[in-house]
């Protein structure tokens, strides 16, 4: 999860988030090299009074600065498209969970079970126990099995919301009348926090998301206790 004065991303908990972090580093390096080159050219132009007449009007230079940006864009686009298709691919999910956004709480339905549904509200600051996180704790956590493909179906009952868990690389809009889906695969157990990421009214900041990823055996015990 995030911590005070954090400058980087949260630690990746899913294969998709790991790919996104690698893509970020790849793109950042390209941007850094381009920025360094531009800064060098500007500095050299400002610090010298000489004019390079051979480069002011040259067919070779125009060819280079047309082809080189195209190559750079391809180097950025190819890994981006690969990750995009990975995020949209859902093959034989082990579990499906339907998430509905409300003003201002989330409701969850485990569609593979007969009657496993609950609402998830933020715990007020006055009711927090020692060690619990302000504005991030909920009364009912979403318990899910780790290392299994889980399909999340996301929609809304009223206005636009967005279901986001940064450490898993998830951010999917909850749109009234539309059912969006995303894939969730957690590589290790733990508590993972998120929040509504679409301004949805006066209590938008009070719609936290808490996922509790556990081994399959513990998930089966939890689901049996909830039925």
From Swiss-Prot:
Task: Report the membrane topology from the UniProt record.
Answer: Multi-pass membrane protein
Give me the Mitochondrial intermembrane side stretches, as residue ranges. Answer: 1-14, 88-227
Which cofactors does this gene product need?
Cu cation
Q: Which GO terms describe its biological process?
A: ATP synthesis coupled electron transport
Sorted alphabetically, the keyword list is: Copper, Electron transport, Magnesium, Membrane, Metal-binding, Mitochondrion, Mitochondrion inner membrane, Respiratory chain, Translocase, Transmembrane, Transmembrane helix, Transport
Record-level GO cellular component terms: mitochondrial inner membrane; respiratory chain complex IV
Q: Tell me yes or no: is Ligase among this UniProt entry's keywords.
A: no
Chain sites annotated for binding Cu cation A1: 161, 196, 200, 207
Quaternary structure, from the entry: Component of the cytochrome c oxidase (complex IV, CIV), a multisubunit enzyme composed of 14 subunits. The complex is composed of a catalytic core of 3 subunits MT-CO1, MT-CO2 and MT-CO3, encoded in the mitochondrial DNA, and 11 supernumerary subunits COX4I, COX5A, COX5B, COX6A, COX6B, COX6C, COX7A, COX7B, COX7C, COX8 and NDUFA4, which are encoded in the nuclear genome.
PANTHER family xrefs: CYTOCHROME C OXIDASE SUBUNIT 2 (PTHR22888:SF9), CYTOCHROME C OXIDASE, SUBUNIT II (PTHR22888)
Q: What is this protein's record name? A: Cytochrome c oxidase subunit 2
Protein's gene: MT-CO2
